[in-house]
A protein has these predicted regions:
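Internal catalytic or translocation cores that form aromatic/hydrophobic pockets or channels
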Residues: 160-161
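Conserved small/polar residues in nucleotide/adenosyl-binding loops
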Residues: 165-166
Length: 166
């Protein structure tokens, strides 16, 4: 049985990738992901088969991963940060319903929120909120409500996808 691994690469620097992520990338003959994330690992694994798609083709990317796995190959789907925090883990599980013969395994990584907090010297020691500013899947009005509620409650707020709004 082939496996699709969803691998969190961490917040961008190679040394922030987990040992488990490195082992999975080393073991899988196929590495697939968003073009920018593939560029982060291509040089380190030159013998691998690389497949990529641009932004906004996440479903297609997941389908490609399963199509490769159906051929009998283990596949590493790479994401930035942690695969389960604004990553591809949820979508892989959704698309994976169509491929019950393929195993799915999530390989967590260091989130951008915790990585950024460490760089800034601002550890997330108490309750905090993580909110994406992307309105691709969430209406902007709902994002605003979440921001207001988190601020009113006194949470430290870690924002994702800020570049969309600068």
């Amino acid at each position: 049985m082939s496996t699709v691994y969803v691998v969190g690469l961490g917040p961008g620097a190679g040394e922030q990738m987990t040992v488990r992520a490195e082992k999975i990338l080393e073991a899988c003959p196929v590495i697939l992901g968003y073009t920018v994330y593939i560029d982060l690992v291509r040089e380190q694994y030159p013998e691998k088969k690389f497949l990529s798609t641009p932004m906004k083709q996440e479903v297609k990317r997941c389908q490609m991963a399963f199509e490769e796995a159906v051929k009998g190959q283990d596949v590493a789907m790479v994401c930035s940060g942690d695969a389960g925090v604004y990553g591809m883990a949820g979508l892989i599980y959704e698309v994976g319903r169509e491929y019950p013969e393929i195993k799915i395994e999530i390989i967590p990584g260091i989130t951008a929120a915790t990585g950024g907090a460490a760089v800034l010297g601002a550890p997330l020691m108490h309750d905090f909120a993580v909110i994406s500013l992307s309105d691709l899947l969430t209406p902007w009005e709902q994002i605003e409500e979440r921001l207001e509620a988190a601020a009113k409650a006194g949470f430290v707020i870690c924002l994702y996808n800020c570049l969309l709004y600068t």
